[in-house]
Amino acid sequence: TAGTDGKTIEDIKGLSDREVIETVRKQLADYHPQSVRRVFIPKPGSDKKRPLGIPCIWDRLIQQCILQVLEPICDPKFHNHSYGFRQNRDAHHAVSRVVSMVNMYKHYYCVDVDIKGFFDNVNHGKLLKQIWTLGIRDKRLLCIISKILKSEIEGEGIPDKGTPQGGLISP
């Protein structure tokens, strides 16, 4: 899916690995993400729509680089039975854990919590502080993450909170 620049992965497939790496390096030297394209998709089981923020392809590549650095550092520090938005964990694993708890410990209580608009209201400062607490101390990287969080949303302006769903470092 194209971002605001109209480019997709097809537009950069012809570049050599060296050209891609050099372009990413140049962009990271003084990183300024392009604006994010707003797209609305249907929410399952509802008439409402979920807003997605679609970054430009080069910004997605940079986010992928960041994800590949952050994930192996942060993931081992997360609770072992946390299943949302984690690699190799899904709803089936969560259900299996619940069934196991019911069978082993006879726990029959379940709480279903859905925090309305959670990702749209994440405090940027608190998120960056949490990333610091998890051991990410590189100030340049934290600055880049901050810029990504504050990427202009086409037609809406610069957000002061929230993580635009649709990027690689967002849910």
Residue ranges and their predicted role:
Residues 20-23, 27-28, 32-39, 77-81, ...:
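Conserved polymerase palm-domain catalytic core
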Residues 8-15, 29, 49-61, 82-89:
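Short coil/turn segments at secondary-structure boundaries
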Residues 49-78, 161-171:
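Conserved pre-motif C helix in the palm subdomain of viral-like polymerases
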Residues 1-21:
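Non-catalytic, polymerase-adjacent accessory regions of viral genome-replication enzymes
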Residues 15, 60, 72-73, 121, ...:
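Residues at alpha-helix boundaries and the short loops/turns that link adjacent helices
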Residues 5-7, 52, 116, 168:
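Alpha-helical hydrophobic packing sites
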